[in-house]
Amino acid sequence: MSHPEPEVRLAGVFLSVYSTSVTRTISGSILQALKRNLSHLHTDTDANFRREIHGYTQKLFDRLRASTATLAKSKSKSSASERARLAFPKPTPGLESSLSKRSPRDSLLESLSFVFWYIRFLEWELRPTASYQSRITALRCLIIVLRSGVDPGVPFASLSKSAQGQLNWAHGLQIGSIKLIRSLLDLILDPYDDVRDAAVSVLQLCLVALPQPDRKRVMSTFPHFIARAEAAMLRTGRADQADGVARAYGMLFTLASHGPEEPTDSQFASKLSLFEHLQTQLKDTLQVTHNDLSRAVDGQPVHGTFAALRYVVDQSDFYALIAGAPQEMFTRWKQLHGDIVTSIESLWSCVYHVLCADAPEGHVPDELEDEISLDTKEILSYSWRGLKEARYATLNFCRT
């Protein structure tokens, strides 16, 4: 696995994780070899190489799930029908060295200790100073680990096909932690699109798997995160940060409750209140655009809000949710939906005189010519970004 040739490294990983019998125990020496080599395997610059590593990680956890379940069943005297998960052994200083000195080796404890180590290793790979390859590989491997079923809180429908079979984990480990969730929130604003997408997927699985009290506690921190992310988006106007904020809103909409919000709840407590918040934000931003285009270009980008609405409306159950709502809520949904369609027309009325001028570089209105901080490129960028996201939102509205 440390050979200079990538084909040999991949062959080494394959031979380490593959077996004709999925319940066959992985030896402690192989697990130690994986620990020594996973760091450089995850950071390979070849995307195809990393894709192969993802496939082998899937095979590794399929085998760990089956082998540990078989070992636990042989050690346990409880009935086979008992479904309560056993706790993972808590790591202690010197555990690894003590395992290597035991005779005979405790294969179950070695395998469970490796799973615990691997999750902590993936968390470390998400650090801000890590390379792009480390971050994206760790995120995709975390998805594999979560979908393997080792966290008992992950819904059955979200598990991989192999994890939905007969051989289930005998032990359970809660993967979502404050440290991991904080790292994932930071990665939602990552410059790379695939990192942002994977971070949202991992975070959503982690939040769904958390016990209800823990989930509520974590969700209570989201308004502060959204406010911080929106402030950065407004300050820079960068498309990647706007997309990160939009993805965060889409995830919050998925996790929000279906019912009407209580007076004490935040604006993100229910799907309707969150959608209403986005519509109000869009309306206020467009009002600024109507009144002072230079101010809007300089610090009130509209494309982030349209992108957030696109991620919300693009969810498969969005219109089914509206159709099944009580009459009073249905009326509010319908009104908000119509207001957003009107806002798309409003954006066009604000920028068409810039984009439709008979000039290749666009037309700068007279009132903006004296703005030293603005040029034609910035005005065109503001206009086209907003219209691009508004177009995607319109396509989602019309498609359904």
Spans of features found by a protein language model:
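Alpha-solenoid helical repeat scaffolds
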Residues: 1-33, 37-285, 308, 316, ...
